[in-house]
Amino acid sequence: MKYLGSFFLATLIANIALGQMTDSPENKEITNYQINRNEYRNKLRGFWLGSCIANWTGLPTENARTDFPFFTDSDFGRDKYDYVLDQNPWGADDDTDIEYVYQHAIEKYNSYMLTGEQISAEWQKHIGLPKLWVSNLSALGQMQNGTIPPHTSVPENNPMWDMIDAQLTTEIFGAFAPGRPDIALEIGHLPVRTTAYLHSEWAAEFYIIMYSLSAIVDKSLSRKDQMIWMAEQARKRVPNWSYIADMYDFVKEAYDNNPDKDNWEKTRDEVAKRYQHSINAGYEYKYPWDSGINFAASIISLLYGEGDYKKTIRIGAMCGWDSDNPTATWGGLLGMLYGYKELQIQFNKTDFADGYDIARTRFNMPIPLDNFTDMSERGIDIINDIVVNAMGGSIEGDNWIIPQMSSEITQASVPETLVSWHTIEDNDPKWKYEGFVSLNENWNASGATLAKGYANCTAEFNFTGTAMQYYAYRSPRGGVVKILIDGVSYGDFSLEDHSGIHGQYYVKIFEKLDLTYGTHSIQIVGDANDTEKTIDMLSIIEDPDSKE
């Protein structure tokens, strides 16, 4: 097993090739896919509508049940939790709005291969607080301070690298590469790596692959079998040592062996016991917005939903944890598979709103109130470019002629890697506070808690390890803290920031990477001014074998 502790090792792994596709025999005949652009335009409208219905259906239960007792099917229905169908316009949320920003960025730069600098520029212009969380928020703060993707996702810079974020912000890259998951992975790689790394990266790629394959899935199969085929293809991408692979395999086996395919709750409860209440496959549950637990939950709704839009979204909304995210992912995929018109039939509703209010969550967009029809038309223009210039295909009348992938999807070629950084929250009982108080419901902060203090506040934490980092919230109200390690002062550090009225979360204020393995202490001492001092979290390396 490879241990990952340093920035340099992280960068080495980050730059390993995508593991695109295995070489095929030279004499293998390459056939073409023919995909009708008018039909695909309908599918893109279905993607946007399906994502929004599912997103807003899942939002009321988001983080409402993150442990036993969970919701069940009996909690869903009229006068309970129910499908959300009547928004006008549809409100943007983080499950759709960052994908919208990526589409805008591709249009703006006239390039489907966005660079790290372009991603950073568009994030800083359009994406920000208050509607931003965990890894997305950590990545934005780094970009504001000069770090460029993919370095915004490595564990040394982003303690939220293993959260769900990329799973809800990058599916659109699969939609942009119909029938060619290899191309989808290429164009989506840097957007994924803006916020995700290793396991969370492969969870996001799993969804991207399924979105891409939805354009060429065998139409003679039942919807259930179509979903299973796409999922099995996506599973090939994930290294067997990853907990994402273990979660897919566990849920798939539980589904296959369950004689009552309506009893999805049984598998959900088994997932909670295996991954939340125990440590398995290298996964240790941290937060209800973990990549891992929500990926497992998504596979439950995927399999038990059996390709039925309503059933899949209902299960996703009731499954628990960060429930609006898997629902939005599958709502978008099934919306593409069905197409806009079939979604209308599903709900016996022909008057869905077409408007999309991106200004609800994102700033400075050229079209603050957009609509699915135009968004889909612009998506077709992007795909035209990708088909010709990335796939080597052509446009013939109303059809794309797309060369078939020359080989099968293969596993990401990354050796088994252990990320050694371990999070210590500000509400950990081992902290010794004088003048600091850990406050709940700080939803933008790590673990939704944030310790605050003012004049002459002090904090001390003892830990065993070889490296540590101190993360804090900086704002216009921020003061100055002195950092001492084992009684030795390392200077004064400002927590003042004027990048925006909402400040910056997940800011790495200080790090010490060359400690001798053993027990150490960090002291954080506020100055005498009545300004705000904060502690969001520590990140430490405990394992002596991971010493840098």
Can you describe what each PLM-predicted range is?
Residues 53, 57, 64, 68-76, ...:
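Catalytic phosphate/nucleotide-handling subdomain of diverse soluble enzymes
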Residues 44-45, 101, 119, 145, ...:
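Mature, well-folded catalytic/scaffold domains that follow N-terminal targeting or propeptide regions
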Residues 409-548:
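Glycan-recognition surfaces in beta-rich domains, encompassing non-catalytic CBMs
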Residues 35, 144, 152-161, 170-179, ...:
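Accessory "access/gating" subregions that flank catalytic or transport cores
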Residues 41, 49, 91, 98, ...:
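Active-site cavity-forming subdomains of large catalytic enzyme subunits
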Residues 248, 252-284, 340-420:
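Acidic, carboxylate-rich catalytic segments that either coordinate divalent cations
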Residues 6-15:
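Bacterial N-terminal signal peptides
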Residues 59-100, 117-123, 127-130:
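Active-site-surrounding "flap" and adjacent substrate/cofactor-binding loops of secreted or lumenal enzymes
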